[in-house]
């Protein structure tokens, strides 16, 4: 994300464009991709001289939409076809029964959805928003577009051609007045917010620069520079203490998987399927490297403030800052900003290359950087960035003539985004001995090789892997999309979760165990009214990555748990979870059809959930051994669709 285009509440005008030429770009985003799209659309509109506002949907009142010439919606799908959290208030306001079919008459809009076709409800959020806008009288002025996470070129594969078509539409339908041309791509749009040194008195305060090349985790840094002590004022966050960070795969195993236990003092409630988000930090070494490359040594340890570029605008006209809560950071230096908030190890988007091309005078570098922004070179862009996972820091090392003004850091670098992890604890595992909340996570540390010699590491999991017990870190609790009811927890269920996908399923199993134990305490000697649960687990090797094996044995009798396993590398013929489902098709048919059970699929997106869905369809066709008429292919597919509609088939993949 670039902070340069982010704007505040609709209704606050930006720089004036031609009369009757305004654009509102709104987004619903869970991980930031829809916000990236919104900001790129906003930049396009600004170059076409639209007075442009960008905002998350929850900050918008539906009745304000008609005051803009055009409105663009960028919406991701999360959970079971849901809108992201920062769009749900807006969505609920559109669902009020009292709204007449003319409520949004005069609103001219288009939309772009972001989804993952491995989910049954692909781009569901954007599609249902589109339909509701039409129901309320809004006019679609340009056909919406859809991005698919599974596309070979990622979201860019469909977004770039959609954006090019939208630009042509705007120029055709909203032509510029004579003598006015679009702002060329090689002309920099001014950032909305900039950094500045605090007044001379504050800047002269003793802020001693650390030896940034020392040890990052336990080195002699001020607290705010250390990875293991997190006191950032992040919105809606909790400060958690790390109790355990244990590797649960052998050192010889190809993958480092960690079992984390975190605690907070407050007795916070959560349910199976909920997620924790963790906001990582950059290492002091990486930040020092950037400071030296950019020549920011003089400013690095001085106190800075983030201020609007145009200080003449009134408070209610100010755009929203790219980073929130900085005003509550008591002594913010440029170095602290880089360590705590700016993602210098992200894989950049095309807009980053466009931004840094303005900061070099070396024509060969400028030309090369601009080539990466050209849609005609999309494959080359992917070959340079996404496929080898080349980071911003590495790119700046290679294009060493780029010198970004420190004042523009927040409008050039993306913001560090929180990463989501499914909570693996439930039932009695949710509380500490002193009444606080306890969270368990199962996290695969991202570490791999590409064509680049240096090993690739995930920004967040590298941060997590370096934390030791006793560390504090910022977390946020978010409601998940599985929404398993008590009836489903104690009823017939089939849980499918290879690898770390078992984490949210473990939460469900321990929750079921707590329900059973509570019933037994209240009804001694009476069998609890529960149905069987089948867990289908997959890994590479039973001896290396059969997570929580001892627990499954412990819970088997208590909650009527049956575990089916598929270890792909323990025999010559590879076996996956879908193969185990196929081998047990009669059992599956009985549980899901005859008993009316529910299915929960968790784990990696892509082939696994699609293969599971196909195998379940086959089970409905061939698993009925009761002698009655078997399902046809169409009937089996329809039955599975019916399960989705009634909440009996849910998927949470990543």
UniProtKB/Swiss-Prot annotation:
The protein's UniProt keywords, in alphabetical order, are:
Cytoplasm, FAD, Flavoprotein, FMN, Mitochondrion, NADP, Oxidoreductase
Residues the record lists as binding NADP(+): 500, 568-569, 574-578
Database matches in Gene3D superfamilies: 3.40.50.360, NADPH-cytochrome p450 Reductase, Chain A, domain 3 (1.20.990.10), Nucleotide-binding domain of ferredoxin-NADP reductase (FNR) module (3.40.50.80), Translation factors (2.40.30.10)
Q: What residues does FMN bind to? A: 29-34, 76-79, 114-123
The UniProt regions of compositional bias labelled Low complexity, in chain numbering, are 1-10
Q: What class of enzyme is it?
A: oxidoreductase
Q: Where does FAD bind?
A: 389, 419-422, 458-461, 654
Q: Where's the FAD-binding FR-type domain?
A: 235-485
Q: Its Gene Ontology biological processes?
A: cellular response to oxidative stress; iron-sulfur cluster assembly; nitric oxide biosynthetic process; positive regulation of nitric oxide biosynthetic process
Give the source's domain of life in one word.
Eukaryota
| Similarity section | Belongs to the NADPH-dependent diflavin oxidoreductase NDOR1 family. In the N-terminal section; belongs to the flavodoxin family.
Subunit structure, briefly? Answer: Interacts with dre2; as part of the cytosolic iron-sulfur (Fe-S) protein assembly (CIA) machinery.
- What does this chain do? NADPH-dependent reductase which is a central component of the cytosolic iron-sulfur (Fe-S) protein assembly (CIA) machinery. Transfers electrons from NADPH via its FAD and FMN prosthetic groups to the [2Fe-2S] cluster of dre2, another key component of the CIA machinery. In turn, this reduced cluster provides electrons for assembly of cytosolic iron-sulfur cluster proteins. Positively controls H(2)O(2)-induced cell death.
The protein, known as:
NADPH-dependent diflavin oxidoreductase 1
Name the source organism. Emericella nidulans (strain FGSC A4 / ATCC 38163 / CBS 112.46 / NRRL 194 / M139)
